Amino acid sequence: MPTINQLVRKPRKSRSSLNKAPALQHNPQKRAVCVKVYTTTPKKPNSALRKVARVKIAGYGSEVIAYIPGEGHNLQEHSVILIRGGRVKDLPGVRYHIIRGALDSRGVQNRKKARSKYGVKKS
């Protein structure tokens, strides 16, 4: 533990909080272009084929992996999409979500509940 004299000479530094979605550069969403659309498997207790896309963020150039939520999608290489922050707990390295129903990403078909999260208009 430091003495009072040591604290007077060099005060304590406050820790800066860690940014969980640095590629968004403090923006709520960013436009991006799909580089590769593929499936991957989750961590140990879970088993599935999760749909993800490697995307290049417009005007920034960094490539990140983004999750494609919902059942079925129409994304392919060169699709222009909108991404938001939000990790997927069982997929390491996936820290972004693709927003369904925005730009080239179509909303989920036949979705009745939680429609706003999947870009579906009221039928």
UniProtKB/Swiss-Prot annotation:
Residues 1-26 are annotated as: Disordered. GO terms for molecular function: rRNA binding; structural constituent of ribosome; tRNA binding. Keywords: Methylation, Ribonucleoprotein, Ribosomal protein, RNA-binding, rRNA-binding, tRNA-binding. One of its GO terms (biological process) is translation. It holds the Pfam family Ribosom_S12_S23. It comes from the Bacteria. One of its GO terms (cellular component) is small ribosomal subunit. PROSITE patterns: RIBOSOMAL_S12 (PS00055). The modification 3-methylthioaspartic acid is found at D90. InterPro entries: NA-bd_OB-fold, Ribosomal_uS12, Ribosomal_uS12_bac. Belongs to the universal ribosomal protein uS12 family. With S4 and S5 plays an important role in translational accuracy. HAMAP family: Ribosomal_uS12_B (MF_00403_B). Part of the 30S ribosomal subunit. Contacts proteins S8 and S17. May interact with IF1 in the 30S initiation complex. This is Small ribosomal subunit protein uS12.
